[in-house]
């Protein structure tokens, strides 16, 4: 279960940092003993700056408790992130043996300055004005095992 939480934390952090012009798509997947996770990221940008990211995360498990735990953790995290940094909209639902989370982060509303200040390691992915760059988002996602096109 700790592996689950670690993976969710990393993916959620990535979700925070990614965020109209060009579109970059990244995806990742992970198979664990009790569940499988697949995540698709659609990163929209204006020039070299990320403006919006849309994430679809699907978690499949035969164990309803695993899905219910994921649902609670994800909803709590997204609600907290939206309260602290703004810019989040999300919907998490369970249908049978599948949990689907649809998340959008609008970087025009997201307080990236505050986020970078609270998460110093993120300076690696932003420019000098604390704007998330497309190259930074790509580097960040790749560091978590995602592939980007």
PLM region spans:
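Sec-dependent N-terminal signal peptides of Gram-positive bacterial secreted proteins and lipoproteins
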Residues: 1-22
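Subset-of-secretome marker
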Residues: 22-149
């Amino acid at each position: 279960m700790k592996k689950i939480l670690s993976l969710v934390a990393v993916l959620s952090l990535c979700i925070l940092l990614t965020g109209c012009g060009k579109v970059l798509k990244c995806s990742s997947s992970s198979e664990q003993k009790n569940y499988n996770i697949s995540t698709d990221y659609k990163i929209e940008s204006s020039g070299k700056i990320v403006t919006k990211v849309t994430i679809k995360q699907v978690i499949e498990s035969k164990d309803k408790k695993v899905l219910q735990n994921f649902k609670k953790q994800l909803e709590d995290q997204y609600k907290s992130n939206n309260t602290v940094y703004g810019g989040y909209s999300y919907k998490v639902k369970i249908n049978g043996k599948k949990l689907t989370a649809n998340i959008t982060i609008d970087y025009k509303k997201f307080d990236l300055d505050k986020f970078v200040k609270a998460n110093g390691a993120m300076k690696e992915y932003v420019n000098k004005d604390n704007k998330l760059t497309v190259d930074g988002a790509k580097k960040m996602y790749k560091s978590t095992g995602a592939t980007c096109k």
